[in-house]
Amino acid sequence: VKSNDGRIDPQGTCIGMRGSRVNAVSNELNGERIDVVLWSPETAQFVINALSPAEVSRILIDEDNHSVDVIVTEDQLALAIGRGGQNVRLAADLTGWQLNIMTIEEADERHEAEDSVIRNVFVAHLNVDEATADLLVQEGFATLEEVAYVPANELLEIEGFDESTVEI
């Protein structure tokens, strides 16, 4: 739900006093459970709202694959996923995005594995040692093309880089 009037609480209005409105609709639907979710034009906020009451720690949006990595603490994992995956499935249907729920530890492991792959590519193709490849990864470089198109003077600004490193 959404309201264009900032003075109105759209969720509270739909739910009613002590749930009277939503209970009336639920009774009409033979006791079907109803969630009232606050709509947002921003994907990250809409996903957070759709997974409520689970508390989301971080969100990583992958526009290319139309997926969202939702990172939660260990104690929030079961709440975010729901019984039999029901919560995450409903949130994915509602938002139109593929949702991947993971713990902070799983996200860190995944990030480290991705960094390791990038680091190995840099070592293999740029003829640099692992320490230099680590510096490139820490600076946010993810592809060979990104490194190739950065002016030499910008690479020299990276701590630990000198002219001999940049020439490689």
Please state what every model-predicted region is.
Residues 1-168:
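RNA-contacting regions in translation and RNA-metabolism proteins
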